[in-house]
């Protein structure tokens, strides 16, 4: 499988019932595969091993860093973007490695473990790396949450949530009191499953689906100031 949003619980379930599966990792600039492992060699939580025709390294800003950017090179890596030297220079290091923009680790056996995107990582007040995508995956598995977006707001983590209003309506639960009870319980369950520095201070309901790119990724940059528009725990009119 090559998927955008991984679900640890689903992977663990497949693994437990001995369902044969594996997960690869790649990008268009690499034609497109970077890492892969046969299902019977797949390490749970990883994205396989780097291809034989490639090299990979984890570039860390400091030796103490928990993760680093996954950088690759090899014969299947593009030479550059067509007629766009500026973008090409941005994506390659001076010594010729392609910056994937993904943060992760690599174990002694060459298995790659992806944690999140470099540009979306949040640095906690105590210096730990917070990967919003991991928290969003957990949130999206909770009752009546269709999609979510974790942002930093006033130095705290806040989850913007687009609820399953259709399901809530069908059960007669789409009112402020019920929504607050449901989301308070979701917040409690989420925070019980994450580290102290990853705890969410608030779930804030969002009135519409989040805007997405053609690849169905949320346009995160649009939502840094969304909280100033929404205050009530119910479904408001679209902004």
Summary of predicted features, one role per range:
Residues 1-3, 228-239:
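Single conserved hydrophobic/aromatic residue that forms the stacking wall/gate
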Residues 4-42, 145-147:
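Gly/Ser/Thr-rich phosphate-binding loop
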Residues 26-30, 100, 124-125, 213-215, ...:
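Ser/Thr-glycine-rich phosphate-binding loops at phosphate-binding pockets of nucleotides
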Residues 50-54, 63-65, 69-124:
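Conserved ATP-binding/catalytic segment of the ANL
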Residues 65-66, 113, 130, 213, ...:
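Generic structural signal for well-ordered beta-strand positions
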Residues 74, 79-80, 103-196:
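AMP-binding/adenylate-forming catalytic core of the ANL superfamily
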Residues 122, 147-155, 187-227, 231:
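Conserved C-terminal "lid"/linker of ANL adenylate-forming enzymes
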